[in-house]
């Protein structure tokens, strides 16, 4: 909203700088982030932890983040936190929105020529230009049938292997063409469990290929200590090139030296705890500002907002993927009661029906995500180990009891009342089963307490009621387009079969 209203990205830089100070007080000097994948397929499960669908906006956000965390745009400064931005070269171009942690999501799709240069790489180029400490490579691999890709005139079409094993992407593109000088950190467990495109290689061959391709630091084993004996064995057998090992070791050690890891690796515990306590009020203030500016008024039919009178009767209903959220119901009931509204038990008794709606995807990739608000929708089942359809069906729910929305709306509208929706947007949902029944929709992205990590702050319900009552004007803008239907997003089985055919031909 700041930028759309003539402002800049300073709020993001202030957030990053405050977070940097807290990390520094705790003795933390490297972050496994931040995530700067561009939102392209709205079904992708990691969209909720990135920022935007606009490449230019992503580049500006990335610049602000690096300024705040690293202390500027000329490398890591004293007391800075080195960012390892991810997931290069953009993991969001995924087949049907599947996560690349699973074999169903191993493919990156580029349907148009130079899509990487136009859409996915501007954020990473901004990170390189600001001298980010590190870049994390993604799990997924490019499809053999992708459209032609170049960057600044350089051919970057590559083998169909994951980025950590891909010399074209790490050397030709990232270092030689984009100018990256930091270290490449692979994602976690890339060696054993998620080696897309190199499954036929042994772990010894894989680790040698990673170093030779341009990886410098091998990601952890899901939180377990990293065992580098394989790297030593591969080097002793001549499988890792001398120049590759020298590059990887040098870049890692230089980064540690820049962060004073050797000279001053520890913080005094009491000093650190005192600093954390001192930062709490600053966190509260900034979290409140960010939450306020993020609220988006998506619909206001017949100007039902702002609410002009307190004392009206309100029926509150909560919807999530797993049923009612008791905490949200309690917060809304408290907030409304304190403001003078009367809580009633039936929609037909109310002047206002307030819907608190928070859809979500299932946790695994056993089926294709849908952006529709559905309960127990039968969809094709996928085997996450093979990446193939099983031939069976499974139930998918994104919003339990979704049919009650129409019922509640009909009841309150029959009495001349209105429906107001508080929508927590974790994905670009298709709202055809919600929007027609609502007179007003206010979008939020996270609660104030979730942003701050504290429990005694103003809640998101308090903040939203201030907007609904007109005390605060909503200025936020959606970071992503809400699609009207799923048909334009789906990838056909024929396209995936073409990939398999291409692979079979390559093996032959």
Question: Where in the sequence are the language-model features?
Answer:
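Glycoside hydrolase catalytic-domain context in secreted enzymes
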Residues: 1-508
């Amino acid at each position: 909203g700041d930028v759309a209203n003539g402002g800049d990205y300073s709020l993001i830089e202030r957030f990053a700088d405050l977070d940097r100070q807290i990390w520094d007080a705790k003795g933390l000097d490297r972050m496994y982030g931040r995530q700067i994948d561009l939102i392209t397929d709205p079904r992708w499960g990691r969209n909720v932890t990135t920022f935007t669908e606009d490449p230019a906006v992503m580049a500006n956000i990335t610049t602000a983040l690096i300024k705040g965390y690293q202390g500027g745009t000329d490398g890591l400064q004293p007391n800075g936190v080195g960012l390892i931005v991810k997931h290069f070269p953009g993991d969001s171009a995924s087949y049907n929105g599947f996560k690349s942690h699973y074999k169903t999501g191993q493919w990156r799709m580029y349907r148009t020529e130079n899509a990487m240069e136009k859409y996915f790489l501007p954020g990473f180029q901004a990170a390189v230009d600001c001298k980010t400490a590190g870049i994390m490579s993604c799990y997924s691999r490019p499809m053999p049938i992708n459209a032609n890709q170049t960057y600044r005139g350089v051919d970057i079409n590559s083998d169909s292997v994951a980025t950590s094993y891909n010399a074209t992407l790490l050397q030709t593109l990232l270092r030689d063409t984009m100018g990256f000088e930091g270290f490449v950190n692979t994602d976690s467990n890339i060696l054993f469990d998620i080696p897309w495109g190199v499954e036929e290689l042994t772990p010894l061959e894989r680790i040698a290929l990673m170093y030779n391709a341009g990886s410098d630091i091998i990601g952890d084993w899901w939180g377990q200590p990293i065992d580098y004996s394989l790297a030593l064995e591969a080097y002793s057998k001549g499988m890792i090139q001398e120049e590759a090992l020298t590059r990887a070791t040098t870049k890692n050690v230089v980064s540690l030296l820049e962060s004073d890891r050797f000279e001053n690796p520890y913080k005094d515990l009491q000093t650190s705890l005192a600093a954390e306590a001192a930062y709490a009020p600053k966190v509260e203030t900034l979290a409140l500002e960010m939450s306020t500016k993020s609220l988006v008024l998506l619909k206001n039919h017949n100007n039902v907002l702002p609410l002009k009178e307190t004392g009206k009767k309100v029926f509150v209903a909560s919807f999530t993927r797993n049923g009612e959220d008791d905490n949200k119901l309690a917060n809304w009931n408290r907030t409304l009661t304190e403001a003078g509204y009367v809580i009633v038990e039936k929609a037909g008794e109310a002047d206002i029906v307030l819907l608190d709606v928070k859809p979500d995807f299932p946790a695994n990739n056993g089926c294709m995500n849908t952006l529709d608000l559905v309960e127990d929708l039968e969809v094709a089942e996928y085997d996450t180990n093979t990446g193939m359809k099983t031939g069976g069906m499974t139930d998918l729910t994104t919003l339990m009891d979704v049919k009650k929305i129409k019922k509640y709306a009909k009841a309150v509208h029959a009495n001349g009342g209105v429906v107001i929706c508080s929508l927590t947007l974790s994905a670009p949902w298709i709202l055809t089963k919600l929007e027609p029944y609502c007179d007003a929709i206010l979008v939020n992205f996270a609660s104030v307490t979730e942003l701050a990590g504290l429990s005694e702050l103003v809640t998101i319900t308090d903040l939203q009621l201030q907007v609904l009552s007109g005390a605060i004007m909503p200025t936020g803008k959606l970071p992503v387009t809400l699609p009207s239907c799923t048909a334009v997003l789906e990838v056909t089985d024929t396209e995936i079969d073409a990939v398999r055919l291409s692979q079979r031909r390559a093996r032959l």
